[in-house]
A protein has these predicted regions:
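Single conserved hydrophobic/aromatic residue that forms the stacking wall/gate
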Residues: 1-6, 165-170
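A conserved hydrophobic secondary-structure block that centers on an alpha-helix together
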Residues: 7-8, 12-58, 65
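Hydrophobic cores of alpha-helical transmembrane segments in multi-pass inner/ER membrane proteins
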Residues: 15-28, 87-100, 152-167
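Membrane-interfacial loop-to-helix junctions in multi-pass inner-membrane proteins
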Residues: 34-55, 103-119, 147-151
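Membrane-interface interhelical loops and short amphipathic "cap" helices
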Residues: 7-8, 12, 38, 63-86, ...
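Cytoplasmic membrane-interface regions of multi-pass membrane proteins
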Residues: 31-39, 95, 99-107, 137-139, ...
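Residues within membrane-spanning alpha-helices of integral membrane proteins
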Residues: 19-22, 50-58, 87, 91-94, ...
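Conserved active-site neighborhood of enzyme catalytic/cofactor-binding cores
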Residues: 62-66, 75-76, 82-123, 127
Length: 171
């Protein structure tokens, strides 16, 4: 618990829960594209997942900002650091997704937008995490430097894409 200001910082995985939650509705969006599910059924099925993800992401950003304000040397609530921005951008997309789902529930419309935002939220979460943890973007959150780390992550991603591309499709 080194460096914690108060009891609210004992649970430090809020942003992670928000990011992982986005993988659920990302998968649902891909499944909806394949199965041609009814648009309103799709909106209802992912609404609670998006809301839970958005809640944890919001709490994570707020508690992190309050912690940064009280921690010496951080200088304020928000520093516009790459790590902070990589959590804020998926939050903006999640907020737009939540609003689009509410519109889609009430009337037919924005189905394509909901699909795109579902995919974009997860993609931004993964890309942001890759950029700040690979060492490509330097930040005040960077505590260790290892130039091979980014190459390892990128190689792993390329390998996974190649395996998925070359695997036989189910019939």
């Amino acid at each position: 618990l080194l460096g914690l200001v108060g009891s609210e910082m004992c649970i430090r995985d809020r942003l992670y829960i928000g990011f992982v939650g986005s993988s659920i509705y990302f998968s649902a969006a891909l499944a909806a594209l394949i199965s041609k599910i009814d648009s309103q059924s799709f909106a209802i099925s992912i609404k609670s997942w998006v809301l839970v993800s958005w809640f944890f992401q919001t709490v994570g950003i707020l508690v992190g900002s309050i912690w940064a304000y009280y921690e010496l040397g951080w200088g304020g609530y928000w520093f516009w650091d790459p790590v902070e921005n990589s959590s804020l951008m998926p939050w903006f997309v999640m907020t737009a997704l939540l609003h689009s789902i509410l519109v889609l529930e009430r009337r037919i419309g924005l189905y394509s937008w909901v699909i795109v935002l579902s995919i974009l939220t997860f993609t931004m979460s993964v890309t942001g995490t890759f950029l700040v943890r690979s060492g490509i973007l330097n930040s005040v959150h960077t505590f260790a430097s290892d130039p091979s780390r980014g190459l390892f992550i990128l190689s792993f991603l390329v390998l996974m894409v190649c395996l998925l591309y070359t695997s036989p499709s189910p019939r």
